[in-house]
Amino acid sequence: MSSKNSIILCTHNEAKHIEKTIFELEKHIKDLEIVIVDDSSTDGTIEIIQRLNQNNKYKVIYRKKSRNLASAFVRGLTETSGDKIGWIDTNMGELASRFPEMIDELKSDKDLILMSRYIKGGGDDRIFIRAFCSKYFNVLCKLILRVPIKDFTSSIFIMKRKVLDEVTFLGYGHGDFFLEFLYNMHQKEFKIKEIPYIQKKDDEISNSKSAPNLIKFSWLGFLYILRIFVTLIRKKN
């Protein structure tokens, strides 16, 4: 297995962020492999990726019929070759500078390092309704699943590839796929460590406050809660 750090980027209309995120990853991570999975972007994201990838240094998958974060991540996972695998939300490129710290943490007995908003030193600067709902959803996850993790909906992590020998990512859903993965890791007694980060304010406050976006946010929240109970039912079976 290659001694690389494979980072997966899942994109859909990320023209504002993709170039900066790739730049920050390349700036801060040694022995880097970038895998990009694009789901039918129409805002110029594809053209930016193609321009940056003229020398074919990234692995890029273009999907025309799918817009599903979980399946995009799983598809990217199949293209990785590193002994460490990570993921970062494409609009959080400024936090790529934290990956060296996370990679160093993996040199210990820890199997996955997770950036967390809800431990000492972390925080959430988004609009109140999003920050409030996200925090207490994570409290609910911890209470129901009985897993000692405070941020199940983090957008940044890195793990040892060996975890995949015993735990599988289920490729459906939105960010809730990671919730179930963390639960299954805990059941298999893998070691998870959280390190703090502060989530920035929404990039477009006006849009974040709009009714359609809050409706979508509420719907995703419902699906996340549903995933908690599906996870428990799957365990019993």
What are these regions (language model features)?
Residues R63-E79, K84, S97-G175, K201-F222:
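Acceptor/aglycone-binding surface of glycosyltransferases and processive sugar-polymer synthases
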Residues K16-K20, D43-L52:
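Acidic helix N-cap motif at the loop->helix transition within catalytic regions
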Residues M1-N5, C10, K16, K20, ...:
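Hydrophobic helical membrane-anchoring modules
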Residues D83-G93:
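Short beta-strand-to-loop acidic/aromatic patch adjacent to the donor-nucleotide binding site
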Residues L32-V35, I46-E79:
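Conserved donor nucleotide-binding strand/loop of the catalytic core
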Residues F23-L32:
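Short, acidic, metal-binding catalytic loop of nucleotide-sugar glycosyltransferases
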